[in-house]
Structures are given as C-alpha cells and as structure tokens.
Amino acid sequence: VPLAGVLNGLGYVMIARIDPELAGLQMMWTVLGVGLFTGVLAVLRNSRNLSTYRWTIGLFGLVLIALPFTPLGTTVGGARIWVSFGPVTFQPGEFAKVALAVFFAAYLVEKRELLAMGSWGVGRLRIPDPKHLGPVLVAWGVSLLVMMYQTDLGSSLLFFALFVVMLWIATARASYLAVGGTLFAAGAVFAWSTFDHVQRRVRVWLDPWEDVTGEGYQIAQSTFAIADGGMVGTGLGQSGQVAIPVAETDFIFAVIAQELGLFGATAVLVAFLLLVGTGLRTAVRADNPFDTLLATGLSALVGVQAFIIVAGVTRVLPLTGITLPFVSYGGSSLLGSWLLVALLVRISDGNNRRAAQRDGQPVVAGRADA
C-alpha cells in the first residue's frame, strides 16, 4: 500500500505540473480509488469466496471487454476502448483484466492437474485434453480478438502475458512458456500483416525520424526529453522546450526521466519492482492454490503493464498506448490499480490471520504484507 501511494502521489505531482486543470480530476480519482480500496476490504472478507463465482466473474470480464463495441463505445486516439454514459467516460478493460485474473486463477486450480499431466500427445510432448483447456483458451482468444479489433494491442499483450504466466505457475510446465512464445510470435506476424495500425506503429518504432513531424513526433519528442534529463534531471517544472503530446498518459515516464533524470526514473522502476515483489511474496506465502495463483496473476499484471509502457517510451518495444499503473492520468486506470492492490492486501491479510490462528497467536486486525 505505501508503494502504491508513493507512485500515485508522484503521478499526481507530475500531472499537476503538466496540466494543472487535470490535477483536480486526478485528485478526485485518487480519492475514489482509495475509497474503492477500502470498500473492497470491507466487503470481501475472504478472497477465496471469489472462486465460487468464477464463471460469473469471467463472463463479466468478457462483457466489459465487449462493451466498447456497443453503441456506448467511443473512439479516442484511434482506439475504441472507451464507454460513455452521459458525461462519464471510462475504460472497461482496466476492470476486465482483474476479473479475468480471478477467473483464470479459479479455473486453473480446478483443472491444473489435468493440464499439467496432459492426456494425449506426440512422443514426449503431452497436450491437455481440449475440453479441459477449452474454457481458458476461449476466454483468452476472445479477449485478444476483441482487443485487436479495438486497435488496443497493449491490452492484448497484457492479457496474453497474464494467461501464459498463470498457466505456467499452475502447471509448473515450462513447455507452456515455449508454446506461449510461439503463439505470441505467430500472433505478432499475423497482426503486422493484417492491421494497418500495427504496421504504422512498427514503422514508427523502427524509425521515428522518417516522419518526425507526423506519426513519429511523439516518440521523437520522448527520446529528446529523456536525453535532456541526463542523470539528475532538469528539475520539476523545468522541462525546457521539449513538449510531448499527451504526456500525462502514454508518455508520463518520459516526463519523469526528463525532470528527475536517470536517478528518478530508476527510483520509479525500483518502486514497481518492489510492488511486484511484494505481490509475489504474498503468492509464495499463501496457504491455498487459489490465493497463490490470483496473487501471482495480479502481480504479473502490474509488472507486465509497467514494462510494456516503459519499454514503449524508451523504444525497446513498439508503443502500445497503455497507461503506467498509479502514475498516468486516468480514472479507469487508477480505480483498476487500487482494486488490484485491494485484492492483494486481502489475500495477504487472510493468510496472515489463518497462520496466526494455527499458531494460537492473537489476530491483529488489518495486518497485511502487501
């Protein structure tokens, strides 16, 4: 929780510096996010209760992903990932990823032995019976297809990584990583050869200077900003002449690197590593498979999402357009991130309580590692 608060606070400071008009809205979303965090802890007394409603939660996640295809859907920045209810616009995919993590965790606990052993195969390669793997593949496939047609490849990659990591942890079979990598490579080639927006992003990634005043302008300005920051940065509010469009969302890490330098950017990355590490420690200490898988999946969501956006800003990967958890501007992202942390805290607190009861020790209310 302290790490999430630090990242959220840093994000607010940077947003207030970039666009003071957005600072008030970000503060409102922060208050609502903390309220959601508190509400989840108050209502959800045992994280394992979520597994009882796995099919409902999984279906809810898919409905959230499909919502932008309805008349309520709105296209912003070329991606149809938003839903509008009057003056309120939100991104349902931020909540769908948490719902699918719950579904995957519950389903993999039930079927992990069958998935690990495999029922048929060729030679030494054992493949699970499709009827056991089918529901997970359907949820994964529908998520990826919908996200690709919404031109939101960042979320597609995030859902894919969530699926592969949780399947690997559930079965302890490294072959799933190999299969996942193969599927990713095939999907990347297919997306590049099929979708114009993917081809444009790859071209901009490989050579932003080819159209530096057009499609390559954002990433070029981001590169200049990071270089301008040097080791110690230009100082808060001293970003000079380098202006990055939409810096408060996709490119906020570039602004951090510019104003706080390499040291500040590294500190942010360390904070994310500590947050993910705390989540994984919660997973390791869990006393039941569902909590272990769910904590692993939630931790993977934070780590992979942070990696994707930082890698996009620094041109390690093509830019995907997702947000930096807790730091970027946006109500949906902030609420989804606080919901995720609330589940991690509930898992940690529940396991600590049960461990204390087994040891005959008094239970301390609210004690948690995450």
Predicted regions and their residues:
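Transmembrane alpha-helices of multi-pass inner-membrane enzymes
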Residues: 317-355
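TM-adjacent membrane-interface loops and short helices in multi-pass inner/ER membrane proteins
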Residues: 208-252, 262-264
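Transmembrane helix boundary and interhelical junction motifs in multipass membrane proteins
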Residues: 152-157, 232-236, 247-249, 262, ...
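Long, low-complexity hydrophobic alpha-helices enriched in A/L/V/I and glycine
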Residues: 51-55, 95, 225, 231-232, ...
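Glycine/serine-rich anion-binding loops at beta->alpha junctions
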Residues: 86-96, 150-151, 230, 234, ...
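Hydrophobic alpha-helical transmembrane segments of multi-pass inner membrane proteins, especially
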Residues: 1-218, 254-312, 339-343, 358-370
